[in-house]
Amino acid sequence: TVSELAATADGMAEVVRPALEMLVGRSFTDAGKVAWEKLEGADANGIRRTDGMVRNATHGEEVAVTLLEPDARQGDVVIWLGDRGRGSLTDADGRPVAAVARLLAAGTAVVGMDLFRQAEDPPARNRAVREDREAAAYTYGYNHPLLAQRTHDVLTVLAALRTGQVGDLGRPRR
């Protein structure tokens, strides 16, 4: 079974990882050439907030990113994926939600991102072709599914983090 294969290093390397890469349409090593652009930053209550964009030149993609860093940062970084994208990091008053606040208090930086079609005002429906011969094959046959596109966004941000491009984080220790 898949769970038995995933429990071994050989099973992961030979079966599970290639299967996931096939489903997603991209591997970590194929994430592409990425660049970080800082858009704005602010410090408040011992937390530095940096908003920026990670651009993937190889695949023509960009991901909006928010980085929250505590003043007493210990070096770890958590990637925070939520239903509201970067908005999942904070409450309506702009304060970090409880779980994010605990991470920051422990000295951990937190990175949130707006995944594909996850911005504050996502479209109400999937796009459709405006012709008599509408066919889902044109939308879904030529494009990766939503899960794969969002996974591409995570891989793009991971690539930027691993190269030390996001904020002032530097290269990871591991």
Regions found by a protein language model. Give the residues of each.
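Cap/lid segment of the alpha/beta-hydrolase catalytic domain
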Residues: R73-G170
